[in-house]
Regions:
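Sec-dependent bacterial lipoprotein signal peptides
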Residues: 1-16
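A small-residue-enriched
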Residues: 18-39, 72-137, 239-252, 264, ...
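Periplasmic alpha-helical coiled-coil/stalk elements that build and connect Gram-negative outer-membrane
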Residues: 19, 151, 158-269, 380, ...
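Regulatory alphaC helix of protein kinase catalytic domains
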Residues: 44-73
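Amphipathic alpha-helical coiled-coil segments
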Residues: 81-84, 91, 149, 156, ...
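Sec/SRP-type N-terminal targeting helices
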Residues: 82-83, 99-100, 136-164, 214, ...
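Short segments within alpha-helical structural elements
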Residues: 196, 225-252, 393-451
Length: 457
């Protein structure tokens, strides 16, 4: 009867411990589909992905040689990325430690004594024992620790990739900002030159009483207004250069760069699975880590079995001293079963379960955020593409209006105020076109980042 009870207890313990051996699987109630909003329809979602835009190496997306050089510098020198790489090394060391926990621990404890009683001759004894102990992982304590270390390593690698993606995207955005500011400065300076010539012409004509002093004042005011905006653009360029230099891990300096018109980015923007995003991977690995922590907390309720032994030479055999020494060996098996730890194990298990639920919620929210970022970037790309043709028409029309108004002014059938208005419209249209071009490039960068791009070749 006692044997039957013992067998039943052992069987119950083994069955209840089966869960602690299970590997992590994504919970079924996690929503990972239908997260993209279709930019062509208000209420539809993109249920499936197409090609691997997010898997393209960054060199195939950012083809400007100057930009490629800057990204290479950033990937080598950015302090956040270097710190993330050190976290990976630390996680690799932790995994190595978890794997070595399966091996026995071996130690050497040599001892020697010299004793004398009542001035008799000294007695010398020695022992050279080698001790070893090995934990039998019957209930998964070591297994879950190793699995936890494995997913932690994956999490740190995913975080490093996320930082790398962020570094590439930030450098590209700042680079394109510089190109946009360069083009705005070029347009503004050209406009200022035109207004300067106009003001000089009006000045000469006003001296011959062809035009009133009001027209002269208007021409000078328009010129001064445009010239006054140039230092603001130059300051923005300087600040962006300094910010990019600092981000590269360098002292502030001028940035070599190309021109806005020469930039070529992917014309078609397909989607890729959100699982390609490193932050999504990191969030899921965090959930897996909490899962294994919960398993470890469960395993703490089960016995811990340890085998230990020692062997070595000694010349002490009880009360007798023998020379030469003899070989002494021993082996011990021990089982430690938790009975009452003042509620520590129960509290630890409850805390682990709560942390696992928190990680699950965080993972789901990360998926939602990722889907939103992809949808926003895709919508921005689509809308900026739609504006391109209309904006070009606006620029061409504003240019023609400016030229025609100037001709009418020279013929005396238009006022100088109309000339200024037409030139201002032309300037505004050109600046808007530059901003649209920048928005489109920024949309590509944002979408590439949102899809987890930024990997090396």
């Amino acid at each position: 009867m006692k044997k039957q009870i013992l067998y039943m207890v052992c069987a119950t313990a083994l069955l209840s411990s089966c869960h602690i051996y299970k590997s992590y699987d994504r919970p079924e109630d996690i929503t990972a589909s239908g997260l993209y909003r279709d930019p062509a329809a208000d209420n539809d979602t993109l249920a499936s992905d197409t090609t691997n835009f997010g898997n393209l190496p960054w060199r195939e997306v950012f083809t400007d040689p100057q930009l490629q050089s800057l990204i290479e510098q950033g990937l080598k020198q950015n302090t956040d990325l270097l710190s993330a790489a050190l976290n990976v090394k630390a996680a690799e060391a932790s995994l190595m430690s978890a794997r070595l926990a399966y091996a026995p621990s071996i130690g050497l404890s040599p001892q020697g004594t010299i004793s004398s009683f009542d001035k008799n001759a000294a007695t010398k004894t020695y022992s050279l024992p080698v001790t070893a102990s090995w934990q039998v992982d019957l209930f998964g304590q070591l297994l879950n620790s190793k699995r936890n270390a494995q997913v932690t390593l994956k999490q740190t690698k995913a975080y490093r990739q996320a930082v790398q993606t962020q570094v590439s995207a930030n450098i590209a955005n700042m680079y394109y900002t510089l190109l946009m500011l360069d083009r705005q400065l070029e347009i503004t300076q050209a406009t200022a030159e035109v207004l300067k010539r106009n003001a000089e012409t009006v000045q000469a004509l006003s001296e011959r009483s062809t035009y009133t002093s009001a027209a002269l004042a208007q021409s000078k005011a328009a010129y001064a207004q445009v010239v006054a905006s140039i230092p603001d653009i130059e300051q923005s360029i300087r600040e962006t250069e300094n910010a990019l230099s600092t981000f590269l891990g360098e002292a502030p300096h001028a940035i070599k760069r190309g021109v806005l018109e020469a930039q070529e980015l992917s014309a078609g923007i397909p989607l890729q699975l959100l699982s390609n995003r490193p932050d999504v991977k990191a969030a899921e690995m965090s959930l897996a880590s909490c899962y294994y922590n919960t398993n470890s907390a469960r395993a703490a309720f089960y016995p811990q079995i340890t085998l230990s032994g020692s062997a070595g030479w000694t010349n002490s055999a009880g009360s007798a001293i023998i020379n030469p020494g003899k070989l002494l060996a021993s082996a011990i098996g021990s089982l430690t079963q938790p009975l009452f730890y003042r509620g520590t194990n129960i509290a630890r298990l409850k805390a682990a379960k709560a942390q696992e639920e928190q990680a699950k919620l965080s993972f789901q929210q990360t998926l939602y955020n990722a889907g939103s970022e992809v949808s926003n970037a895709l919508s921005l790309y689509q809308n900026t593409s739609k504006k391109a043709e209309s904006r070009q028409m606006q620029v061409e029309s504003a240019k023609k209006a400016s030229e025609d108004t100037k001709e009418l002014f020279n013929l005396g059938t238009s006022t100088y105020l109309e000339v200024l208005s037409a030139q201002q419209s032309y300037l505004s249209a050109q600046i808007s076109q530059v901003s649209d071009c920048f928005d489109k490039m920024q949309a590509v960068v944002s979408l590439y980042q949102a899809l987890g791009g930024g990997r090396e070749d």
